[in-house]
Amino acid sequence: MGQRISSLPRRSLAFLRALKRNNRREWFQPRKEQFDADVREPLLAIVERLADDLRSIAPEIVVDPKTAMYRIYRDTRFSENKTPYKTHVAAVFPWRGLAKHEGAGLYFHVSPDEVWMGGGMYSPQTAQLQAVREHIAGNVRRMRAIVESPGFRRHVGELEGERLQRVPHGFPKDHAAAEYLKYRQFLAGRELPPAFACNPKFYSTLITVFRQVAPLARFLNEPLVNR
């Protein structure tokens, strides 16, 4: 496979579908080697190829194949759902100078239900969210230029994420950035059918989407990396 892999094999999706039906240790443990061969290794090949291509898109992104990929095991300590395994595989690419789940980054996952690729800021802490909102308020033209660009609209769509119903405290209700200031999450991406993970265009589409989302992630991270 090497670095030229362009999609996951059909057996990857077949295994994830079977895992969704049989999410039990006694089913998975005898098939751990099959999971590694059918799912983990092809995904790792995708991530290793991304390590080269993402450097030209956003040199600030950290692409470490060993840490980018999420483990298949679920942390069930504080969850009512005690199924031991995730039924999707995913990888995340954070920004240099920020922790893995701090700030904005790029991300994709493959599940039996969908493929999602994109990025943004998923769960900023209160102080981080305030810093990002202040940054948007002072740079609304730049923000608008990113999320309303033809390429962003064509390949990603619209900015998404949880939103407040009103402009947050501390900002004028009629602020030019009012609609952006309401966001509690800043997400941008593309959802595709699960079978698309096995399409020869999977990798090229992933690169195209990441190329459009990277400027948004860079903009959102500016007030965080410069603190």
Report each predicted region and the residues it spans.
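Short, charged, low-complexity amphipathic alpha-helix
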Residues: 1-30, 187, 200, 223-227
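Polybasic/polar functional segments that serve as interface/processing modules
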Residues: 4-10, 45, 52, 210-214, ...
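Soluble extramembrane domains of integral membrane proteins
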Residues: 59, 63-95, 99, 145-163
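A solvent-exposed interaction/effector surface
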Residues: 77, 125, 171-205
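Aromatic- and glycine-enriched beta-alpha-beta binding-site module
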Residues: 77-137
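Compact, glycine/acidic-enriched structural inserts
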Residues: 112-171
